[in-house]
């Protein structure tokens, strides 16, 4: 079985929900969360600028995530995270911040630390992440 499939299965189990996202979907949810904290209200164009992707890509992702129950859009086309979407976004963002902070603390260039954190945040299992977090806290 491929590693990424195992990670996704663990993620599903962790959320106690049959719905799951892809790495790209998690990136979109994380971006919406970050932008909501920064701007309050989020539009597709904001997500496109933040992620440096095309507006059609955002529209496709928003549609897919809406169908999955991760977000909604209102009559003014603002994007809102559902409880499920917020849960996923917050978990991914927490991991991102954790890895970025610790990579920088060991001397990794901030840009490289951000890029590496963005990759690792999706693939690490919940169990491994929690054990790593515990071990760092104990030190």
Question: Language-model features: where?
Answer:
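N-terminal positioning helix adjacent to the helix-turn-helix/winged-helix DNA-binding module
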Residues: 24-27, 43, 84, 95, ...
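Arg/Lys-rich, alpha-helical DNA-contact motif
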Residues: 93-126
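Canonical helix-turn-helix DNA-binding module
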Residues: 44-75, 79
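Residue-level recognition of specific faces of alpha-helices
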Residues: 31, 61-64, 70, 84, ...
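C-terminal regulatory/oligomerization modules of transcriptional regulators
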Residues: 2-13, 115-139
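Basic, amphipathic "hinge/linker" alpha-helix immediately C-terminal to the N-terminal HTH DNA-binding motif
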Residues: 77-95
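N-terminal helix-turn-helix DNA-binding core of bacterial DNA-binding proteins
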Residues: 16-53
């Amino acid at each position: 079985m491929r590693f990424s499939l195992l990670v996704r299965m663990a993620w599903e189990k962790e959320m106690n929900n049959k719905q799951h996202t892809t790495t790209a979907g998690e990136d979109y949810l994380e971006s919406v969360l970050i932008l909501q904290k920064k701007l309050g209200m989020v539009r597709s164009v904001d997500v496109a600028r933040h992620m440096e992707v095309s507006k059609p890509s955002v529209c496709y992702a928003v549609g897919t995530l809406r169908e999955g129950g991760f977000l909604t859009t209102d009559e003014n086309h603002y994007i809102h995270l559902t409880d499920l979407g917020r849960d996923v976004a917050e978990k991914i963002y927490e991991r991102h911040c954790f890895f970025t902070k610790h990579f920088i603390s060991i001397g990794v260039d901030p840009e490289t630390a951000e890029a590496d954190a963005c990759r690792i945040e999706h693939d690490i299992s919940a169990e491994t992440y929690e054990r790593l977090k515990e071990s760092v806290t104990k030190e």
